[in-house]
Amino acid sequence: HNIYEKVYPASTTKILTCLIALERGNLDDVVTVPKASDITVAGSSMADLKPGDQLTLRELLYGLMVPSGNDAAEAIAYYIAGDSDKFAELMNEKAAELGATHSHFANPHGLPNDDHYTTVYDMYLIFNEAIKNDEFVKIACTPEYSCTVRNEEDAEQPERTVSWTNGNAFLSGKFSFADNMQVLCGKTGHTNAAGFCLVLGETAGDGHRYISIIMNSPIYEQLYASMRNLASKSQQ
């Protein structure tokens, strides 16, 4: 339904952010979290990172995809492109390259911006490309992740452990998935403008992969019930 209609992607944006980072970055590089990661927008999902924190790009990508950290998204954008505006240019270039021509990205995390939008079909194209990357699938299917963060600027706590839980309720086990189907990986999203969103890759019992996308669901529980129904239908 309405696969070409303009929608707000919210944090499903991070699928593209992760894909670009995997293509352009070195997973073992140590990245320093910039001041721009100190996001104070109410309700903003965070990975509990502070400016000056140091962690590898690989760890940052878990911080991006597991707890949906907007702070991690900013840090990745600065590492790859120097700032988030330049990173957004890379996002739009990549989207165009994949044929996602009815999208425009203005930031790496998906916080509300009138100039930041996509369509279900474009999001399918982007996610379909992302799941060709084994590292992407590995990161985006992880229910929980912990890592050690270092910060030389923090005299009281130069080293600490951060732990993240995936917001995808199918991965956390909060909701059961369709019979004879297994969740491959996915990304959630939510803002008032975008509603509740979920982009999901799943594997059927016969090994076939499917992609299911729901955007702008008004109710959290309804999103997961609808997604389970959608995934069940793909086998009929």
Model-derived features with residue positions:
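Penicillin-recognizing serine hydrolase domain
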Residues: D83-Q236
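Active-site-adjacent loops and short helices of periplasmic peptidoglycan-processing enzymes
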Residues: H1-Y121, A130-I131
